[in-house]
């Protein structure tokens, strides 16, 4: 069974605060093709509809040799038609270039972010990349056997950069992780555990930080640079065993998966894991662990 949001009828929902009610078309800035990669439709709720394959197409611009491998058809969970592309690697510098030139352009954040916030956000991206690289090196045991991150290993991580509403972001990962048939990128228990940890921490960091950027009038407390970096240090699995246990026991070890049950667990601050949405809660939990 493939992941639900990879099916043809589904799409990634991205929260985009549009300046007006008109349709916004985001051009592919690095392609000679005149057709836009992503069409953004501004609605009264300012939701945009972007297929997952469009996100992959943005990544594809890193390597022109893969041109044409990604088709107009949405991706399937086994990534079988995209193996050549997804097996490509890219460096930290290339990834940060993607963050700056693609993600910031995509979300139109460059006009709303203060220079210091952009630096912190890029540093956050870099730290997450290096944490994933370190974990993958440990998994492959040999120091030099995995010095570049495969695109297939960072695909799910990249979705976190879409500025979704909180519950919409979590729904994407619910649809990924709930499937037993995890195929390539989730077949390793060690890597899957690490991605779960990454999901918990980075979703908290990104939701808190980026909601603050676009919702300053709502009184969301800023996440300081030092606090953000301290949270990133917990990306090492050895420091997150209790965190993983909480998450696994309340959701992933169940025989059946129901979105409404998961939503309740996620929003339950005291007995679930809704605490990751609040800075005081995550600090308390991390201190306990």
Question: Which ranges hold each PLM region?
Answer:
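A glycine-rich, coil/turn loop motif that links secondary-structure elements
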Residues: 142-144, 184-185
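A positional/structural detector of protein chain ends, strongest at the extreme C-terminus
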Residues: 1-4, 287-289
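EF-hand Ca2+-binding helix-loop-helix modules
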Residues: 3-141, 151-179, 188
